[in-house]
Amino acid sequence: MDKLADLNYTLSVITSMNDTLHSIIQDPGMAYFLYIASVLTVLFTLHKASIPTMKIALKTSKCSYKVIKYCIVTIINTLLKLAGYKEQVTTKDEIEQQMDRIVKEMRRQLEMIDKLTTREIEQVELLKRIHDNLITRPVDVIDMSKEFNQKNIKTLDEWESGKNPYEPSEVTASM
């Protein structure tokens, strides 16, 4: 770990890269200099970033196989992106996580569709009841016996002794 963080070690790697690049530049027929330089830069960055990270992860992690697998998959995906590919390498764990996420989302969508369908059915039933109540039905004979102002009225024939009880009678008062 000390060697990886040492400034002299980093400078020696940079110096060796510079020497390699200068030897390539001296060849006048080299047309792919920029591509080679960018690949070497990426490789150096991966070297400096991945080795210390991998060592720390292996020391702190209980399952070293998963850490190594994850680091290798990440490096391969980075190289594929740099090469211009849109595809990515995935592990079985990632595929299972994505499948679980998709299944969970599908269940949520089905529950929402079920709730919306139930609400729509209730709304249709309510609209049907409202429509049925608004339809006017033709009536041939109107029954006036249930009208409020017709309940307690008696005709002259129905009064006792044929006399109207509501007519004022003569009252004589003694003085």
Swiss-Prot record:
TM spans (from-to): 29-51
Record localization: Host rough endoplasmic reticulum membrane; Host membrane, Host caveola; Secreted
Annotated membrane topology: Single-pass type III membrane protein
Pfam family for this entry, one: Rota_NSP4
PTM note: The N-glycosyl content is primarily Man(9)GlcNAc, with a small amount of Man(8)GlcNAc.
Glycan-carrying positions: N8, N18
Lumenal compartment residues: 1-28
SUPFAM superfamilies per record: Rotavirus nonstructural proteins
Keywords from the named record: Activation of host autophagy by virus, Calcium, Enterotoxin, Glycoprotein, Host endoplasmic reticulum, Host membrane, Host-virus interaction, Ion channel, Ion transport, Membrane, Metal-binding, Secreted, Signal-anchor, Toxin, Transmembrane, Transmembrane helix, Transport, Viral ion channel, Virulence
One GO MF term: channel activity
Residues in the Cytoplasmic compartment per record: 52-175
Example GO BP: monoatomic ion transmembrane transport
Entry comment, domain topic: Binds 1 calcium ion per tetramer.
Name of the protein in question: Non-structural glycoprotein 4
Organism from which the protein derives: Rotavirus A (strain RVA/Human/United States/Wa/1974/G1P1A[8]) (RV-A)
Lineage: Viruses, Riboviria, Orthornavirae, Duplornaviricota, Resentoviricetes
